[in-house]
Every structure is written in C-alpha cells, then in structure tokens.
C-alpha cells in the first residue's frame, strides 16, 4: 500500500487495493465510488497517487482538490480527495451531493478520527453506492515483499524480522526504515537499532500533534498500557476526552490498535521529545503509580530500552529496584547504583541485590561501608549481607560473628548452622522461639530455624529427623524464596544430608524444586546445580554430570571458593570414574588450589573425600593430608556423628586401597562397622567396605560380594557397586563365580550383559582359568591407554610393542572378561583399573593381623 520508490517496483498491495486498481485499469471510465479509511502512514496517499496515474494514462482528467460549495464539477473528471477528515462540513456536503447524483466518479480517503457527522454520512453513502476499504499494516510477508524490492536489503529473514518488529508493519515506517538501512551495514548481527536518521524522520509527525497527545505518547512510551483514569490525571482530561486523544493518536499512525507503540515509534517519542517534558511525564507517572499502589518497573524498563534511564527520578529508580529484587537481582543492583549515582545514599538493599545476583565483591564492599557509617537498621541488614557473602567464601567463623551481631531470628539460626559447620558444639541447644528484636516470625525466619534444627539433628540425632527438618525448611522457601539471602540453602543442606544417607532421589527432588522456584536467587542457583552434578557423578552418569557442571558457569562469573571446591571435586571424580589419568593429572593443581582457598568445614567433607581418592590415585595424597586431619578433628569435636563421618571413612578406605596401606584400610573398615547401626546407608557401606578388603586379600565370597555391590547400587553408589563386583571377579579363582560377578558388574552399570550366565563349568570356556589372577601388568597398561583414547598404533609406540600385539592384548582381555563387544569391554575396564595403583596391581594383600 506504499510505493517502493527505491527500486521502482510499484506498490506492495493488500487484496482490496489490488482488486480496485485492477478494475480501474480494465475500465477507467466505469463507475467509481470508494471510501478509503486508514491511519496516517498506511498508504492512502500512495493509493490515490496510483489511481490518478492509471486514469491519466487512460486520458481521463483527475481532480485532487475537494470542490468548494457551489463549484461545478465535470462528470467526466475523476475526483480523488485525500485527508477528507480535515475538510469542513460544507465541503464534505459537496462531496456527499456528488455521490448522491451517481454521475460522478469519486474516491475519498480519510483517517478514522476525527469523524464528524457529515463525514460519517459521506462514508456511509460511499459504502452504499460503491465500496469502503480499510488499509491495515503490512503482514510479515508483505514487509518481506517490500524489502525484496530494495537491492541493498533483499529478502534476508533477519532483516525482515527486524524491520517488521520495529515498525509493526506500518507502511510509512517500513519505507523509512528500509530507506535508512539501504545505506548502512546490514550484515547479520550488525543491525541492532534503527539508524538515527530514520528516527529523526518522525520529528515532524510528533511536532504537529497537540501537547496532550505528545504527553500521552510519552506516557505510553514509558509505562506501556496504562488505565484511562491514570492517563486522564496525567493530561488533566475527563475519561471521554482521553478516549478522543487515544483515537487521535491511533489515527495518526503512532499508536497501535492494541494501545502500544512500535519500538521505532517508542524510540522516536523518547529521544525526540524535550528532556524537561519527558522528565515531567515520568515523575508524574511515578507519582500516580505509587499513589495507586501500582508498579513502576515497566516505566523504568522502557526508559532503559531507549537510553533515558538517567532522566528517571531517584524515587522511581529505588521503587523499581525493589520491585526487581526478587526476580532480577542484577537489574535491581543496577537500578540501585543508578539511584546512588543520582545522589541517593547507598543502602543495605543495594548490597542485598548485589549479593543475590552473585556479585559478592560489590556486596561486601557496600556492606562493609554501611557497617561503619549507616544507621542501626541498615547496619543490621548490612551485617547479614556481609555474613552471607563471607559464608560463601569460606570465612564461616567471621560469618557466624556477624550473624550473631545482627541478632534477628534468621541471623541467629544461620549463626547456629555456621557454628556447627566449624565444629562448635556449644550452640547445639534449641534457640529461643521468636525474634529477639520483637518482630513477628516470617516464613524466611521459620525456614532458617528449621534449617538450624536439621543441622543440629544431623550431628546429634537420627538422620531421618535431620533430613525431615531440612526438607521441610526447603519447602517453606519454595513459594517465595527468590529474594531470600542464604549462606547455604535448606535445599542444598537437605540434598547433602540425603546424599550422606544414600537417599539420592530425595536429594534430586529437593534440588529440582529449589531451582524451579529460584530459591536464593542466582547466588544459590550455582550451588544447587553443582549438587545435581555431584549426584549424577556418584551414580556413575559421568557424561550427564559433566553437562550439568557446564551449566554452572554459563554466565561467565567466577565461582566462589565453596562452589569452586565442589566443581573441582566433580571434575576429578568424573575423570577418576572415566579412568582418565591425563585429566586427573591436569586437574590436580586446580583441585589443590580449591582446597587451599576454602577452610575445612562440615559441609565440604564430601568433596574433600573425593579429592583424597584422586590424590591417592595420583600418588600425591600427602599434600591433602593436613586438610584431612582438620576434617577428622572437626568430626571429633562434634562427637564423630556417623551421618558425616561415614562418607569420609568410605573415601579414606579407597584412598588407602590405592596407596596400598592395608592397616589404614582396616582402621576405616573398623570405624565403618562401628557406625553400621546408625542408618541403612551406614550398614550398606560397612558391609561393602568389609567385603572389599576381603576381596583384596584374595578371599572372594561371590554371594557376599554381590549382596554388598547391589546394596551400594541401591543406595545410589552405582559406580562403586559395579566396581566392587568387577574387582572381585578378576581376583577369584572360581570360573563360575567370576562369570557371576562380571554379569553383576555389567548389570549394575546399567548396560546389557554379554549373555546369560553359564549354568555349568563346562560352558565357561570364555572365562579365565582358576590359575589366573585378574589382568597382567601389561594388560593393565594397555587397558589404561585404551581408556585414554589412544589408537593401537599410539599404544604400541608408547609401550614399544607392535599395534598387532596391542590388538591381541585387547582381544584376550575381552575374551577373559566375557564381554560381548568393545563397548562392554571399555565399561568394565573402567571399573577394573580405577583402583589400580601403579606398583600394587593384582597383588593380594596380606591377611589382617589377629589382635
């Protein structure tokens, strides 16, 4: 409905105008009585120009000015009148009489508003005697067709989407933007905003509007869709008059039928309007919104989109920041900072926003300043922010001090959690009910109190009570916990407790709900995802664990020390389970740094234990020993609570296995057996530990081993269960037992077995003979290099043997281990080489000394 004057490609027409032009072209002298309605910029003038051209080419006279009253009009002349809504009633009545005679050919174009009674009568008459046509915005396809006529632009989807989104398909605006883009860099990704020259073209359209319309446009640009009552107060008009203003603005093609501005019009309104007027409208809108209890965040977001945030009043910025705090803490921090730059004093809410967003540097800097200079209420909130940030960075002792100083109910509970985490049993008594400051107990305070109860029960009560309290605390925060500032979330502590109890499904569910509810904001989201990755790793789902770990750092921010420790332990744990010795060596330095950066506490014993096994595998356990001593001392101060000590003992056992220290392994087994009555998980781990050392001493009871392995699998330690069965299989001299245990190992890995277990000894020709003890040293070397991804030729070069010899070694291992295919062989080899220390492979341990 507008000429593409850039490429002389004619018009982009909707069906109605196209049919009209076709009819006129076929019979220029035929009857013609048409009313064309459409907002400004929708192509009325372009269509009339094309109608004039068609008639003139046919030799028919064209008149484009409405006749005066009493002026004669030649019936052979086509009358084409534009902007009929601007005519006075006298001229409209002249046109009405021309229609009534039915001797004249007439086309009248007008906007939908203003519409006098005379114009309405004329439009009705044109509809009765001919047709009425409404011009609408381009569809996306029509926008694409228009751009296709511009050689510099073509029909690229990204440009079509950009132009159509910016203009809403208004033909005038499409033409302006296309013309402006034709002379600029339009490579993919280069076009982000309309060129300034295009935006400037809207200046005359805005300047001719009444002041009230200009204020209305500014209000809609800033606040989106606003109620009529609010607009009326802004422009000092009654509701009926506001409706007229809205209709006038729509008729000008500046406001869409949905009451919204297109992006390019919003940018023009905001950037071309006088700053003083824009500020006045923004302030007034803010006053009206705040007075009616409305939100101001959409107002501020609109101003930010066009780069006018600096014009926003401080009260608006702080109100919007408070609204954004729960869902967009980073944006809230930005708004608080803008308010501070405009002269508003920094407050604890600004530090809170920075902390929730995960920007602990800014949070600590602001909180420290407020602790020294702010009024008591802000100082208390600043202390909580600083305490939380310090907890995330491992300074739990200082965090506890600040929480105690803050003195609120939540802070007191978090101080209890932190004290227990550092081994302080002096706070294990139940805290007094209620808030010390006299404030009512909030859901946040109740959750904090339950969290403290759960952590207390984890060291001095039954594990079921601890887990129940922590899961309940997590549930309290799920409906509205996005703005809850937490040193550690109840969900994370519940998941840790569940992992220590072997209840991995409970851990997964509570973490999933916490992430879905955004509990603790972005600050805690990383913690929750890391624990999800930990659970996947423990189960042996190493690929999924790696993928989940990758999501933790997608935002590009560095991990805080506690999260860094867990991330390092997950990477090392995945590498160990994949038998990737190269990755273990590459990651060891970073893992040690992570341990050094975070002091040992109760909630980091899990990664410390995993790193101890990795250190033992690398022959470098001594560098971790001081931290392991600290961990054992912490547990001793707490009375060696089985819930926390059992997993560390389990890790210690495997470290002792890798370093070939039978006496140390026996100590861990003894401790695990002593704790076996504490929980089902402790009993399973104790039985597995006892079975494992028996296997290493060459005493393989396939029934006991399989029961222990399946017990580990059922408590979530799937990879460990498969490993125990595999280790026993290669150490037994009984061919039938070996087959049974290999089948068990395959089943526990979640992979299909190589076939049904043979029923008799005669059918076990593929199983190792009774004199064979596991894999030979050379086979272990080949297995490790195969698992590292080397080719047979590369392995041969490394071991100074031929590639053919390597192939024979692999074939013998596959036959000996009764694997149906290479995939099964690789999976089983991972369980067999994981515990192999370079100097002790395949050597049975001495029998335990009888005391």
Protein language model features and the residues they cover:
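Alpha-solenoid helical repeat architecture
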Residues: 240, 257, 294-297, 343-348, ...
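Helix-loop-helix "sensor" segment of P-loop NTPases
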Residues: 22-26, 105, 114-166, 180-195, ...
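Helix-turn-helix DNA-binding segment
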Residues: 214, 762-851
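Short capping/hinge segments at domain boundaries that bridge a core fold to an adjacent linker or tail
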Residues: 45-47, 194-199, 222-229, 239-287, ...
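Extended alpha-helical scaffolding segments used for macromolecular assembly and cargo binding
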Residues: 33, 277-357, 366-369, 702-724
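Winged-helix-like regulatory helical subdomains adjacent to P-loop NTPase cores
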Residues: 190-225, 234-237
């Amino acid at each position: 409905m507008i000429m593409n004057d850039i490429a002389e490609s004619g018009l982009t027409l909707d069906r109605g105008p196209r049919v009209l032009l076709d009819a006129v072209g076929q019979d220029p002298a035929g009857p013609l009585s048409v009313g064309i309605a459409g907002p400004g910029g929708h192509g009325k003038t372009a269509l009339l120009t094309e109608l004039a051209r068609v008639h003139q080419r046919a030799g028919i006279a064209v008149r484009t000015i409405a006749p005066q009253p009493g002026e004669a009009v030649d019936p052979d002349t086509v009358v084409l009148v534009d902007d009929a809504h601007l005519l006075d009633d006298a001229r409209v009545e002249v046109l009405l009489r021309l229609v009534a005679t039915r001797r004249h050919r007439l086309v009248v174009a007008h906007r939908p508003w203003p519409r006098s009674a005379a114009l309405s009568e004329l439009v009705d008459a044109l509809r009765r005697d001919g047709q009425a046509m409404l011009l609408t915005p381009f569809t996306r396809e029509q926008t694409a067709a228009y751009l296709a006529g511009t050689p510099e632009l073509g029909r690229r989807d990204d440009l079509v989407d950009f132009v159509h989104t910016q203009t809403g398909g208004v033909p005038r605006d499409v033409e302006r933007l296309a013309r402006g883009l034709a002379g600029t860099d339009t490579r993919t990704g280069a076009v982000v905003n309309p060129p300034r020259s295009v935006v400037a073209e809207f200046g005359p359209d805005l300047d001719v509007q009444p002041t009230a319309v200009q204020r209305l446009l500014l209000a809609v640009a800033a606040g989106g869709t606003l109620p009529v009552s609010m607009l009326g107060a802004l422009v000092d008009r009654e509701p009926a008059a506001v409706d007229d203003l809205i209709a006038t603005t729509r008729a000008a093609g500046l406001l869409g039928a949905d009451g919204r501005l297109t992006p390019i019009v919003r940018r023009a309104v905001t950037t071309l309007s006088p700053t003083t007027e824009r500020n006045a409208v923004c302030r007034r809108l803010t006053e009206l919104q705040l007075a009616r209890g409305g939100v101001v965040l959409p107002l501020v977001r609109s101003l930010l989109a066009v780069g006018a945030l600096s014009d926003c009043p401080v009260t608006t910025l702080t109100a919007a920041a408070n609204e954004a705090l729960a869902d967009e803490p980073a944006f809230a921090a930005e708004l608080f900072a803008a308010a501070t730059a405009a002269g508003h004093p920094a407050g604890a809410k600004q530090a809170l926003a920075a902390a929730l967003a995960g920007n602990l540097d800014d949070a600590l800097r602001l909180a420290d300043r407020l602790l020294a200079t702010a009024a008591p209420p802000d100082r208390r909130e600043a202390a909580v922010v600083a305490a939380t940030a310090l907890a995330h960075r491992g300074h739990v002792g200082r965090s506890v001090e600040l929480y105690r100083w803050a003195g609120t109910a939540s802070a007191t509970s978090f101080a209890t959690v932190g004290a227990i985490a550092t081994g302080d049993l002096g706070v294990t008594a139940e805290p007094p009910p209620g808030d010390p400051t006299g404030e009512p107990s909030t859901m946040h305070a109740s959750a904090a109190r339950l969290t403290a109860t759960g952590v207390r029960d984890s060291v001095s009560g039954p594990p079921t009570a601890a887990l129940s309290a922590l899961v309940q605390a997590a549930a309290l925060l799920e409906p509205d916990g996005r703005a809850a500032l937490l040193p550690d979330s109840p969900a994370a502590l519940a998941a840790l407790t569940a992992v220590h109890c072997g209840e991995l499904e409970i851990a997964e569910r509570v973490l999933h709900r916490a992430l879905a509810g955004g509990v603790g904001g972005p600050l805690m989201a990383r913690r929750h995802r890391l624990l999800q990755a930990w659970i996947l790793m423990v189960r042996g789902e190493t690929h999924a664990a790696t993928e989940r770990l990758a999501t933790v750092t997608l935002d590009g921010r560095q991990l805080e020390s506690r999260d860094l420790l867990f991330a390092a332990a997950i990477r090392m744990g995945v590498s160990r389970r994949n038998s990737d010795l190269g990755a273990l060596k590459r990651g060891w330095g970073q893992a040690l740094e992570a341990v050094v950066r975070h002091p040992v506490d109760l909630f980091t014993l899990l990664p410390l234990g995993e790193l101890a096994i990795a250190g033992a595998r690398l022959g470098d356990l001594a560098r971790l020993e001081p931290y392991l001593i600290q961990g054992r001392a912490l547990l001793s101060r707490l009375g060696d609570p089985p819930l926390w000590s059992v997993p560390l003992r389990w890790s210690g056992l495997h470290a002792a296995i890798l370093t070939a220290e039978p006496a140390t392994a026996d100590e861990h087994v003894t401790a695990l057996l002593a704790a076996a009555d504490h929980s089902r998980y402790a009993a399973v781990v104790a039985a597995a530990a006892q079975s494992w050392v028996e296997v290493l001493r060459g005493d393989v009871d396939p029934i006991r081993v399989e029961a222990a392995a399946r017990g580990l699998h059922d408590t979530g330690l799937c990879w460990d269960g498969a490993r125990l069965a595999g280790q026993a299989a290669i150490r037994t001299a009984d061919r039938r037992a070996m087959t049974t245990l290999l089948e068990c190992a395959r089943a526990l890995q979640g992979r299909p077995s190589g076939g049904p277990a043979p029923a008799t000894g005669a059918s076990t020709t593929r199983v190792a003979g009774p004199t064979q003890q596991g894999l030979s040293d050379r086979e272990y070397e080949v297995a490790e290099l195969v698992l590292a991804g080397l080719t047979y030729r590369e392995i041969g070069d490394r071991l100074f043997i031929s590639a053919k010899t390597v192939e024979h070694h692999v074939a013998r291992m596959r036959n000996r281990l009764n694997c149906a295919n290479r995939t099964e062989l690789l999976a089983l080899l991972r369980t067999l080489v994981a515990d192999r220390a370079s100097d002790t492979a395949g050597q049975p341990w001495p029998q335990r000394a009888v005391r």
